[in-house]
Amino acid sequence: MFKPKKKLGQCFLIDKNFVNKAVESANLTKDDVVLEIGLGKGILTEELAKNAKKVYVIEIDKSLEPYANKLKELYNNIEIIWGDALKVDLNKLDFNKVVANLPYQISSPITFKLIKRGFDLAVLMYQYEFAKRMVAKEGTKDYGRLSVAVQSRADVEIVAKVPPSAFYPKPKVYSAIVKIKPNKGKYHIENENFFDDFLRAIFQHRNKSVRKALIDSSKELNYNKDEMKKILEDFLNTNSEIKNLINEKVFKLSVKDIVNLSNEFYRFLQNRGRL
């Protein structure tokens, strides 16, 4: 009997109700090409194969090959890619949707890799606490860097809370099925790399004002504290709206506010040759 590997974070989804919930949430048609990350025993893969034109499955664990071979005997629209999902070049795969029970230890990096690649819709399984942070609104305890990094690029919603009993082996925590739809055009991010550095800097001190957070985390933007103080003094003189935002506590700013502030700060630094 196959034993899931702890080091790979393997918790196989075995409850057919939640498999169906994930597939239904993806609104699949016979025109859709789906990417799945993590084969497991193929229970989700089979439902995807029934409902989509083609299914790509990325799986790192070759010991699951018997399950893969059995599925490929039954369905001719499944292609298995043996490898690490974080290393596979997703641009070489022509999928438009993603449905997966993600290994939880790669939740964050694989989510942003997928968003960068682009897709029409994703339905992904996460730890429930992680999912709550993804959908959190400003002013709440779960609102943080992850919330803004995701919501500035996609609309997210929790579709279902999933109990440990839905998996084998049972994890110690609840999970959640999350629907993600890229929101291209909703927010304009001037420079993606700068924006991510800006988020890292300010959310290290989420309970402080943006001004204090930027000074205390100035190294994230490659400045020392004295340089950042001087830069912010000059920046504050640009307009009154910026002054209000920069003196507000980080966790109270909306996604829109943070995107706008990051863009203004980026342009300010660029115009003065400080980048």
From Swiss-Prot:
Residues that bind S-adenosyl-L-methionine: 13, 38, 59, 84, 101
A single GO molecular-function term is: RNA binding
Matching PROSITE patterns, A to Z? RRNA_A_DIMETH, SAM_RNA_A_N6_MT
Which InterPro entries has this protein been placed in? KsgA/Erm (IPR001737), rRNA_Ade_diMease-like_C (IPR023165), rRNA_Ade_Mease_Trfase_CS (IPR020596), rRNA_Ade_methylase_Trfase_N (IPR020598), rRNA_adenine_dimethylase (IPR011530), SAM-dependent_MTases_sf (IPR029063)
Give the top-rank taxon of the lineage listed in the UniProt record for this protein.
Archaea
**Main subcellular location:** cytoplasm
Q: Which UniProt keywords apply?
A: Cytoplasm, Methyltransferase, RNA-binding, rRNA processing, S-adenosyl-L-methionine, Transferase
For this record, the Gene Ontology CC terms, alphabetical, are:
cytoplasm
Per UniProt, subcellular location reads as:
Cytoplasm
GO term, biological process aspect, one:
rRNA methylation
Q: Which Gene3D superfamilies match?
A: Ribosomal RNA adenine dimethylase-like, domain 2 (1.10.8.100), Vaccinia Virus protein VP39 (3.40.50.150)
User: Mind telling me which SMART domains this protein's record contains?
Assistant: rADc
The EC number(s) attached to this protein equal: 2.1.1.-
Sequence similarity? Belongs to the class I-like SAM-binding methyltransferase superfamily. rRNA adenine N(6)-methyltransferase family. RsmA subfamily.
Question: What's this chain's function?
Answer: Specifically dimethylates two adjacent adenosines in the loop of a conserved hairpin near the 3'-end of 16S rRNA in the 30S particle. May play a critical role in biogenesis of 30S subunits.
Query: Which protein are we looking at?
Result: Probable ribosomal RNA small subunit methyltransferase A
Say which species the protein is native to. Methanocaldococcus jannaschii (strain ATCC 43067 / DSM 2661 / JAL-1 / JCM 10045 / NBRC 100440) (Methanococcus jannaschii)
